Each structure stands twice: as C-alpha cells, then as structure tokens.
Amino acid sequence: EQEEQRQKNAHRLKAAAEREAIFIAEREAAERKRREEEKERQRREAEIRNLPTTLYACVSSWNSHINSTLKHKYFFNYYSYYTHKNDATSSMWDTWKTVWNFKNDPSKNISSYEHTTALNKVIDLVEGELRRTFGSKTEYLTLVCLTASTQRKTELRFKKFAEIVCKDLKMNNAYPYIRVAGEGGAMHEGGTGVTSKSYDSSFFKGKYIVLFDDVRTSGNSLERERRILENYGAKVICAITIAQTVRDY
C-alpha cells in the first residue's frame, strides 16, 4: 500500500509539474504574441504618421507637367484621330482602340469582348504600376476615377475597373461617393471637360488619393478634381491615365 501511495503521489506531482510547464509555456507564448502585436502596432502607427512623406516620395520619379505639381503616370501617347487617321501607325491604332474600348461608350457599339479585353489590359497596367510604386502601401490609398460626361457613361467606364483594382490592391474605392449631376464633354473630343458632380465630402477627409482617367489632355480636369478633394481634406498623391494627348504643332 505504501508503494502504491508513493506511486500515486509521484504521478500527481508529475501531472502538476506538467500542468505548470504547460501554463508557463502558454503564458510565455501569449507574452511573445503580445510583444509582436505591440511591435506591429507601433510599426503601423509610425508608417501611418509618415504617409504624407513616404507616399509622395514613392512617386517622385513620375512625370511632371508645366504649371502643375501633380505627379502623373501614363502608358501611351494619344494622337488626334482626326489628324492622323489617314497616316496612323499601328501603335496609334492600338492606343485608340484601347482607349475607345475601355471607355465603353454606349453610342460606339463596343462589343462586350472588346471592352473586357481593353478593361483587363488597363487593369494589368494600372495594378502593375501601383504595386511597383507603392508596394503594400496601396492599402492606404483611395482610388478616385474622374467622372465621364454622364452618370451612365461613368458607370460603364469606371465602375467595374474601380471595383477590381481596389479589391486586388486593398485600396479604398471612392466610386460610390461621387455622382454626376450635369453633363459635359471630353476635352480630347472637343468638349469642356466640365460636369456638375455631387460628392460625399465626409468620405474624403484624411484620404490619400490616386486619381485615374482615360486620357489626360491639358491636365485641367485632374487639377480641378485635385482642388475639390483637397478642399474636403484629402491629399492627392498622384494621377494615372491610360494615355497622354500629344499635341501637333
């Protein structure tokens, strides 16, 4: 009986020691996790504090234009179709078709296949550029697509594009927070480029903005959008367009 009792005591002591060891290990693991989470929290806080500096630094090598401090990236030169349609190069035609098919204007009889092909091409270009430029910092950015001349055209042109890019890059999507109230016309097609729009101004406060449009001509539309958003408390970091109009002099 004494031997049996001794073994029971030994077993209890061993079990108690094992429970204590498990408790200590779990406590140490919890402490390590807490320290790691605190370290990550401090890193993110520092990263967020430095965003105004680091995000602008990311685009320091992008294009600058006369009379504008807005950094701009584009992928193709856009020549006037009406000037060059009879002597256009294959590159000009490729750019025209990419822009036209992306814009998906309901009056132009663009097929679903043509639009989807152009959409995927532009998404790949834009996402690739943003990843290379900002890395994981895309999560701090908000994508603002400049509106077309009507709400319907804006939806056909930008809604799906914005949804996909923002989902893939974990960006904020500003598309639902801007609506067209009046009509204008595209500048590179002879319009004024001015539309009447309504903004959910509270959404933009403190946001870091990437502007997007299909074609930049004079840059006035981008600058106008920049001023509006900055008046709402946003910081406009840069602009991306599919193409840049090349003037013939």
Task: Describe these PLM feature segments.
Residues 138-149:
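Short glycine-rich phosphate-binding loop at a beta-alpha junction
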